[in-house]
Amino acid sequence: MDKSKENCIAGPVKTAIALGDGPKRVLVTQQVPSQNPLSANSGQAQRVLCPSNSSQRVPPQTQKLVSSHKPAQNLKQKQLQATGVPRPASRSLNNTQKSEQPSSSAPGNNSEKELATKQKNEESKKRQWALEDFEIGRPLGKGKFGNVYLAREKQSKFILAIKVLFKAQLEKAGVEHQLRREVEIQSHLRHPNILRLYGYFHDATRVYLILEYAPLGAVYRELQKLSKFDEQRTATYITELADALSYCHSKRVIHRDIKPENLLLGSAGELKIADFGWSVHAPSSRRTTLCGTLDYLPPEMIEGRMHDEKVDLWSLGVLCYEFLVGKPPFEASTYQETYKRISRVEFTFPDFVPEGARDLISRLLKHNPSQRPTLKDVLEHPWIMANSSKPSSSQKSKDSTSKQS
C-alpha cells in the first residue's frame, strides 16, 4: 500500500516528481509491469523485505477503477491544490460505509436534553459516501492490494486521494485485520504531519479509503532525485517526524513501519506520515510479529522479542542516516546479511556525515531499546536545534508562553 505519482482529472498536473538514480534495493520479488492505463509505475527500487510481508510489496494484479462519471475537462491547475478549495462536508465514520465526522466539544452547561437534540440533528446530517460522489483522476501510486487515485468530491470540489483496495486480494492475503486497524487508528489522528483519513466506503468487490492529498508525493522520490539530503532538510524532516511520532505515542499508537516510502510531502513541503497498516495501539504492541521493511526493523523485532514504542526511535535513526547518506545503514546484498548487520548493529559513517548527526544516529541505533533517547531528547538534540528550520510543538508552546509573560 505505498508508492507515488499524467493523466489528470482535467489536464496535466505539474507536480509530478522526476525520478533519479536513487538508493538501490535488493529485489526479492519480480516486478511485473502493469498494462492498466490507470496504473502508475512506481519507479522505485525494492528493499529487502522480511518473510511475513515480502509478498505484499509487489505490483497489484491488473484491475481498473471504473467511475460512472467522466472527469471534468477544464479544471485549472490551482484547483488541484487541496489548500485552495473547501474540504468535503464532515461525515461520520462508523462500522458501515460512512465517513468520519469530527467531534465537536459540547458546551459544559448543556443539559442532557439539549445534548440529545444536538446529537439527533447531527445524526440527520450524516450520509454514506459512494463512488458516484467523486470524480476519479490520474493514479498517484500502486501497491499489492490496489491503487491510489487523485479524486475530487463533486459537491464541494475538494481535491483528495482515494485508495482503492480489492477485497479478494485482502482476503487471500489474510490482512483484513490490518486494514481495519489502519482505518481505526489513522481516522482518529489529528496532526499537521500525519496524513488525514477522512473516511471510507465499500462496494461488492472493493474498499475505498478517502485520504488527504499530498501534492508533492513521497519523500522516497525526492531522495531518489537528489541522492541525499543536506543537514537542514534532514534535521527539519526529523523534527517533523519526531513531533508526529510524539503525538502518536501520546495516543498509545506506534507506527512500526517508518520509511521514506511511507512519508509524503504536503503542498508547503511539510512531511506527512502515511500508511498506518502496520501500526498498533501500544497496549497490544508487545508482540513478536515480524512486519514492515527489514532495513528499518530494530533488533528486538527481527529477533522475535517483545517490543514497544522504542521501535519507532530505531527507525528514526535509520531514516536520519539514509537522508544524509542516501542508503540505509544496514543495507546488504542479501536478506541474511542485512539481518546479521541489524542484529549486531554493524554500520559505518561516510566521512561527509557531520559529527552532530553521527552522535544523534549512534544514540538512536542502540541494540537495547531502553538505551535509546526519547523523542523529546531527539527534538532537543544540539544538531537538530542548530539545523532544523521548524520548531517542534513543544518549542512553539515555550515560545508562546514566554511571549505572553
Swiss-Prot record:
Biased composition (Basic and acidic residues): 111-127, 396-405
PROSITE patterns listed in its UniProt record: PROTEIN_KINASE_ATP (PS00107), PROTEIN_KINASE_DOM (PS50011), PROTEIN_KINASE_ST (PS00108)
Modified residues (Phosphoserine): S42, S52, S343
Keywords of the record: ATP-binding, Cell cycle, Cell division, Cell membrane, Cell projection, Cytoplasm, Cytoskeleton, Isopeptide bond, Kinase, Membrane, Microtubule, Mitosis, Nucleotide-binding, Phosphoprotein, Serine/threonine-protein kinase, Transferase, Ubl conjugation
One GO term of the biological process aspect: mitotic spindle organization
Main subcellular location of this protein, as a coarse class: cytoplasm
Domain Protein kinase: 134-384
Record PTM text: Activated by phosphorylation at Thr-289; this brings about a change in the conformation of the activation segment. Phosphorylation at Thr-289 varies during the cell cycle and is highest during M phase. Autophosphorylated at Thr-289 upon TPX2 binding. Thr-289 can be phosphorylated by several kinases, including PAK and PKA. Protein phosphatase type 1 (PP1) binds AURKA and inhibits its activity by dephosphorylating Thr-289 during mitosis. Phosphorylation at Ser-343 decreases the kinase activity. PPP2CA controls degradation by dephosphorylating Ser-52 at the end of mitosis.
Record-stated family: Belongs to the protein kinase superfamily. Ser/Thr protein kinase family. Aurora subfamily.
Complex and partners: Part of a complex composed of NEDD9, AURKA and CTTN; within the complex NEDD9 acts as a scaffold protein and is required for complex formation. Identified in a complex with AUNIP and NIN. Interacts with FBXL7. Interacts with CPEB1, JTB, TACC1, TPX2, PPP2CA, as well as with the protein phosphatase type 1 (PP1) isoforms PPP1CA, PPP1CB and PPP1CC. Also interacts with its substrates ARHGEF2, BORA, KIF2A, PARD3, and p53/TP53. Interaction with BORA promotes phosphorylation of PLK1. Interacts with CIMAP3. Interacts with GADD45A, competing with its oligomerization.
Name of the molecule in the record: Aurora kinase A
Lineage, top ranks: Eukaryota, Metazoa, Chordata, Craniata, Vertebrata
